[in-house]
Amino acid sequence: MERIKELRNLMSQSRTREILTKTTVDHMAIIKKYTSGRQEKNPSLRMKWMMAMKYPITADKRITEMIPERNEQGQTLWSKINDAGSDRVMVSPLAVTWWNRNGPMTSTVHYPKIYKTYFEKVERLKHGTFGPVHFRNQVKIRRRVDINPGHADLSAKEAQDVIMEVVFPNEVGARILTSESQLMVTKEKKEELQDCKISPLMVAYMLERELVRKTRFLPVAGGTSSVYIEVLHLTQGTCWEQMYTPGGEVRNDDVDQSLIIAARNIVRRAAVSADPLASLLEMCHSTQIGGTRMVDILRQNPTEEQAVDICKAAMGLRISSSFSFGGFTFKRTSGSSVKREEEVLTGNLQTLKIRVHEGYEEFTMVGKRATAILRKETRRLIQLIVSGRDEQSIAEAIIVAMVFSQEDCMIKAVRGDLNFVNRANQRLNPMHQLLRHFQKDAKVLFQNWGIEHIDNVMGMIGILPDMTPSTEMSMRGIRVSKMGVDEYSSAERVVVSIDRFLRVRDQRGNVLLSPEEVSETQGTEKLTITYSSSMMWEINGPESVLVNTYQWIIRNWETVKIQWSQNPTMLYNKLEFEPFQSLVPKAIRGQYSGFVRTLFQQMRDVLGTFDTTQIIKLLPFAAAPPKQSRMQFSSLTVNVRGSGMRILVRGNSPVFNYNKTTKRLTVLGKDAGTLTEDPDEGTAGVESAVLRGFLILGKEDRRYGPALSINELSNLAKGEKANVLIGQGDVVLVMKRKRDSSILTDSQTATKRIRMAIN
């Protein structure tokens, strides 16, 4: 107060006012501060001061020929005095108004194309709906978010090359446009920008907005996709939020969302196959999302989600060094630990072997709906500060932290046996066993944890075992905070390794991710996901498996045919037949396979018995490990449409219908493709039918007269021998069997003989 009086007193003296207003500022430090460097030190003051002058703008000399010296009101638009230190003209702000009203009109056709991101934003806002404003405490946490809707996902370097190629095509400098997306964008933009008059620099700047993902680390309470982030300032303050529904979607958000769904489906599917890593890679390489190859998206898209990161790790890409447990992302912020195997007893006296982390560590835990700070010692939780959207979310975080702490009271709280399995029916590791157990029911865990009196700390309250808040008591070491915990800000990526069971480890051997961490949430993808891999056929149910399997055989018939005759085992082991096995009743799979393989062997042995349709029809059944049995089948069962349906070994059925005239195959009424048949197949079927019941003795033997035709064979008596002409023009000696034995024994004996006979 005294100081203010003193200043008032000074100002009342006219001399003071004169000194302050008239004296030049010549203090070196001040001059230095305001004149060194190109950076404006006080932009708003500078702007106000400039605009108060008569001619604050400078322009190229040509402007004097394009703008009159005075406007209609007689106000001067530009000064005849040149700008000091340059040969530009000093111009009044009124000149801008004149130009906007009377200046030349140019074509506006390029504006929506160049300023595409702005035009689209206006559309989204126009069609968006703003709801009521709610006043409540906002739990915001800083997350890395995409602030630039509607962009492609090129890297900065790739975008730079595209921009140079589009905007300055004639500039020198090595530019190699390699990726599909680069070439596509370049072609499209060059066409759009023909005869464009907008300044190249502006075009370059706008192109950058369109091609590169820009992320910022911002405090967010609600949706994190870019169409929400662009209105962040309108939808959430410190103590209020406004409901908002975007008036449109942008491809980059759709790509992120669809990528997560595709990755989850692929990881879940790979986890149950014989070789998860090989299957995962095969699926990533053969999948397209919205017409773009998934592997290209993975290389460019920075989305961090468990399944996406497993796919990236499999491709040898770097991923974030944080690890995942129970759906929370853990990042160690201080401390260190060594791992040691230890055997512990559950409350049910079951022995578990757990890897204990010894040492003091601090972590941040970030989940979708809750965040926390965790401090722990060896098998002891020291402190957990949680914040979350609701009671349920807070409870989830507490369970995960309690299990992660490996405390004895948590292990002793287990009631009953732990025998959770993953999708491939393998037992989960002990930590995930415990997690699943308590996620199902945490009552005993919370009751046994112990409670303590708490001090009154600003912004923090206690939480009781029944999840009710309290200011007096709380579960031991656990507090609920009003403030969220920020996501880990660094975008640092580390080299990781992945084993065949899709467990991802950092270079120290710590497990960062495993298929158990992949969310089971199902969603509907915004962009079309095309899985070309046979492993994903079953995603649309059994019918799709059936149709796809037969389509695949028909598409690849030429190679399949050769393998069928030369290397059947390799053919039976093909990945493409794996999904089909789930349709065949488990109990009889082996017998079917044995039967079909023997039938095929017989076709190979008895010349001329090659029957394309039958091979195609029965081939998928031969893929299961065969059981030797004497069983013969006239039809094979597959489980589709909720019941067993029959495929006839000889002849058509609703499941497998081959039309000889049109050569079209329909499976369950769906078109499965056209067969290009072998020319000599017409008669082959007849011959094979007759040759059954005959024993092949060897090469042609002239003593038994001229070769008979197939039809004449039927006149032979049992035990009688004759030469016979078979399909491929070979003549062999046969004997009519003395007794009617099974087709199968027929072919087994014929095997060696026919080869000898022909060769």
From Swiss-Prot:
Q: So which domain of life are we looking at? A: Viruses
Instruction: Please provide, in alphabetical order, the Gene Ontology terms of the cellular component aspect for this entry.
Output: host cell mitochondrion; host cell nucleus; virion component
Record localization: Virion; Host nucleus; Host mitochondrion
Q: Where is this site: Mammalian adaptation?
A: 627
One Pfam family cited in the UniProt record for this chain? Flu_PB2_1st
Task: Please give the InterPro entries that the UniProt record associates with this protein.
Answer: Flu_PB2_2nd, Flu_PB2_6th, Flu_PB2_C, Flu_PB2_CAP-bd, Flu_PB2_middle, Flu_PB2_N, INV_PB2, PB2_helical
Q: Name one GO molecular function term.
A: RNA binding
Biological processes, Gene Ontology terms: 7-methylguanosine mRNA capping; cap snatching; DNA-templated transcription; symbiont-mediated suppression of host cytoplasmic pattern recognition receptor signaling pathway via inhibition of MAVS activity; symbiont-mediated suppression of host gene expression; symbiont-mediated suppression of host mRNA transcription via inhibition of RNA polymerase II activity; viral RNA genome replication
**NAD listed as a keyword:** no
Q: Where is this motif: Nuclear localization signal?
A: 736-739
Q: Could you tell me the keywords of this UniProt record? A: Cap snatching, Eukaryotic host gene expression shutoff by virus, Eukaryotic host transcription shutoff by virus, Host gene expression shutoff by virus, Host mitochondrion, Host nucleus, Host-virus interaction, Inhibition of host innate immune response by virus, Inhibition of host MAVS by virus, Inhibition of host RLR pathway by virus, Inhibition of host RNA polymerase II by virus, mRNA capping, mRNA processing, Viral immunoevasion, Viral transcription, Virion
Q: Which family does it belong to?
A: Belongs to the influenza viruses PB2 family.
Q: What does this protein do?
A: Plays an essential role in transcription initiation and cap-stealing mechanism, in which cellular capped pre-mRNAs are used to generate primers for viral transcription. Recognizes and binds the 7-methylguanosine-containing cap of the target pre-RNA which is subsequently cleaved after 10-13 nucleotides by the viral protein PA. Plays a role in the initiation of the viral genome replication and modulates the activity of the ribonucleoprotein (RNP) complex.
Its subunit composition reads: Influenza RNA polymerase is composed of three subunits: PB1, PB2 and PA. Interacts (via N-terminus) with PB1 (via C-terminus). Interacts with nucleoprotein NP (via N-terminus). Interacts (via N-terminus) with host MAVS (via N-terminus); this interaction inhibits host innate immune response.
User: Which HAMAP family does this one have?
Assistant: INV_PB2 (MF_04062)
Q: What is this protein called?
A: Polymerase basic protein 2
Record the organism: Influenza A virus (strain A/Malaysia:Malaya/302/1954 H1N1)
